[in-house]
Amino acid sequence: MSRVCYVYILLAGILHTSAQVNFRDSDSKSRQENHRPLQISLSAIEQLSNLSQTSELNEILKHLLVERVVGTQGHENVRNYIVDYMRNLNWHVELDEFVDNTPIFGKLKFANIIATLNPTAERFLVLACHYDSKYFKDQVFIGATDSAVPCAMMLDLANTMQSQLNAKRSDNSLSLQLVFFDGEEAFHQWGPKDSIYGARNLAARWEKENKLKHIDVLLLLDLLGTPDPHFYSYFKNTESWYVQLLSAEERLDQAGHLERYSYSSVTPNQQTVRYFQPHSYHAGIEDDHIPFLQRNIPILHMIPAPFPDCWHKICDDASAVDISTVQNLIKILRVFVSEYMHLNI
């Protein structure tokens, strides 16, 4: 009889705990769906714009603009540089290491880098890119836009916004997470088993660990650094957040904070060129977001259409990068992150 009572009490406790977990999950989902940006003032926009440090950005790029094929010394050096950089900013850094079969090279060891401002937070805005470069037989391919520059942008954002982000470090409701995927590039021919190695592994792992539910939005950066990129809203369920990127660009422009920018209202006689187009576009682009999209994670894809002329060509090196454009995009991201996370600027 006592054993039956014990089982009954234990079962009741489990059911009660399960109900609490389901309630918390439902409550968190509601907060994700109802989350809205907190628009910052023009003086705050100016403050964020003035955080740009071209010398520091160039120093970051110097370490990233090297060949980064998985399994090479250059790849290992870049991985260590990113890890050390984020740890020196006092972020929590985790490596998602795994081995997978590849054509040409057989088994290779991969490592996704996950840097988190506050790992105990309930929800995360995730910025992501890949840090490997494509393999070319008998040629050195740097992959400046693909994706050394996006990596540099994310590192620069974390560095230049230290003060603003540190004030949010103890917030357990919402935090910022930076993911540097490994193995995005195919070794032989793009396909479901020869591409996005890191993204496939991490999405599956986080699904198994029930961590995907903590992601509000995954903003993926790719093929960035050439002048005058055109971006579009690729996914209907994140159109409102795409509009925030577009709005950040417009407000930075109107305040005169974008460099060598030909859409500028300050110099209206120039040819009209804006980065974030007020249009949606079903591009069907395959990238690191796919395993997360398949698991119903909201995606923002900051990738230009059309792709840069140097895409997967040897000319995708430092000479393809326009630093003014890169700084402009970082400024837009600073405003977006600040407004998404309700930072006190």
Where do the protein language model's features map onto the residues?
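Cleavable N-terminal signal peptides of Sec/SRP-targeted secreted and luminal proteins
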Residues: S2-Q20
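N-terminal hydrophobic or amphipathic helices/low-complexity stretches enriched
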Residues: L15-H75, L117
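A non-catalytic alpha/beta surface segment that caps or lines the substrate-entry region
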Residues: R24, E56-T120
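Second-shell loop/turn segments in exported
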Residues: S43-L51, L64-G74, D100-P103, K137-A148, ...
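Solvent-exposed loop/turn segments at secondary-structure junctions
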Residues: V99-T102, P119-A121, Y131-Y135, G183-F187, ...
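Structural recognition of the beta-strand scaffold that forms the well-ordered cores
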Residues: I114-T116, F124-A128, Q177-F180, D216-D222, ...
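Acidic/histidine-rich catalytic neighborhood of metal-dependent amide-processing enzymes
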Residues: D138-A255
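Active-site-adjacent substrate-binding region
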Residues: V217, L224-I345
